Amino acid sequence: MTNIRQILRHVLLLLVLVVCGSQAQAGSARIIVDTRAETLTVMRGDTVIKTFQDIAIGRYGKTYFKRQGDNKTPLGNYRIGWINRDSRYYIFLGLTYPDQEAADRGLVDERISEAQWQEIRRALKEGKIPPQKTPLGGYIGIHGLGQGDMTVHQQYNWTNGCVALTNAEIDQLLQWVRVGTPVEIR
């Protein structure tokens, strides 16, 4: 009788863990950056958790064809790859840019070599951060202002391709994100 109870207890525990794990996964946050509306929205499923207004993006707008140093924000789907809490921009949420689509376009357009394409592909396949120093650019993220000028932030798109919030906003955003959080920039 005790063996049956122990087995049932283990089965019940396993079911609880599976249900809780799937609910946690379903309840995970994702970020949508709308470059046209200049907003960053935190979503959980179809529910809006928080929208940050008046974000800043790259000083020369947005693109699907990013090049290193073009000061444009790359459009696409990424994940938060790392979090730097000691950044000159206060806090930096590094994105897994370039993604496979950017690498494919870069190879077709001959902006990157086949070896660079393979490196990006391998890193993404292994769940690692793709190479950040290719002709496609890198070190794209969501960050605060650091010691930057709030007036400039409120009036201009000023970044080198990143998405910028105020320091207070990035602090608030941190409660919903972690390494692995999906980020769509559109």
Model-derived features: where do they sit?
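Exported/periplasmic cell-wall-interacting domains
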Residues: K72, D86-R186
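Surface loops and adjacent helix of pleckstrin homology
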Residues: M43-G45, I83, Q175
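Bacterial N-terminal signal peptides
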Residues: H10-C20
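N-terminal post-signal-peptidase region of extra-cytosolic proteins
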Residues: A26-A29, R36, Q53-W82, A123-G127, ...
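Bacterial N-terminal signal peptides that target proteins for export
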Residues: T2-L12
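Short, surface-exposed loop/turn motifs at beta-strand boundaries within globular domains
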Residues: V33-T35, V48, T73, R88
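N-terminal targeting signals for Sec/Tat export/insertion, comprising classic cleavable signal peptides
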Residues: T35-I55
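Short beta-strand segments
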Residues: T51-Q53, Y78, I91, I140
